[in-house]
Amino acid sequence: MCIRDRVYEGIDICRQQNIEFILAVGGGSVIDTAKAVALGFSYEGDVWDFFENRNEPEACLPVGVVLTIPAAGSESSENLVITKEDGLLKRGYGSEKLRPQFAIMNPETTYSLPFYQTACGISDMLAHIMERYFTKTEHVDVSDRLCEGLMRAIISNAKLVKQDPENYDARAEIMWAGTLAHSGLIGMGREEDWGSHAIEHELSAIYDIAHGAGLSIIFPAWMKHVYRENEERFVQFAQRVMNVELPNSMVYETIMEGISRLECFYTSLGLPTRLSAVGIDSSHLEEMAKKANSCGNFKKLDAVSYTHLTLPTILR
């Protein structure tokens, strides 16, 4: 969401009309815009200051949500992401003050969504889980199982929704899974990564590509690049989530098959898994790498450095 076009305008309207509560009706972009307006309402400076970690909010307007697009999980999270058109900067911020007061979630509101939009949302919520799942924190079996159960539920119900867009039960499962995926519950007690999201933010800041479509490209590439640093976890993902059954001695093959099945799942939903599939060439790779490298929010899976050399490799 472009901060220049919507957030400043919303802040001005709220101040002029003495608004006391913001109701966001929509998906992640709508909710995040509402949160940004709530964040800037009582702040005398530029609301972008928060996204550059220059200040902390003292007060925010309360926000409520009527969810129409399950994807971002913003209806239950303290986080938001917006884009500043000047410099094409896409940045996130989080504060408990921004967690919505309530969220009304009726699966029937999602029946009319184009399936591609539904698929992008599914990719986003899977990525939210995987950013937390791929960790080196030990003894997190409970949250591992929560992550795995959510991913399996999303994958199986995505197939049902593809067959029947008005399958209420499948829509409900996906909507609930998207909320849990980014509520903070499954990340408790474990180091999270968020490298793939940071890379994708630079991609969708420059190009007109849906966030979920960018993630379906970036995440498998990232997995192929970093798996050596924690092979056991990638084997676990392949076996428990993607149902790969190969001999225990075939570690590399198991990992690659797990990633391949994830890519095939994305493809089955009509999502891209290569930059070339969405017409993106290499002209901005170095620029995106430099911006992503300066984000400062990478919690690494491993000892792999997200350098200017590493990032273009993942992006390609």
Model-inferred region functions:
Residues 132-261:
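Active-site segments that bind and position negatively charged phosphate/pyrophosphate groups
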Residues 1-5, 307-315:
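Conserved small/polar residues in nucleotide/adenosyl-binding loops
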Residues 42-139, 236-240:
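A glycine/threonine-rich phosphate-anchoring loop and its flanking beta-alpha core
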Residues 31-35, 39, 63-64, 76-80, ...:
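Residues on a specific face of well-ordered alpha-helices
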Residues 11, 98-103, 190-197:
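Acidic-glycine-rich active-site phosphate/pyrophosphate-binding loop
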Residues 3-45, 160-171:
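N-terminal small/polar loop signature for handling phosphorylated ligands or for N-terminal nucleophile
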Residues 220-305, 309:
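Mobile late-domain/C-terminal helix-loop "cap" segments
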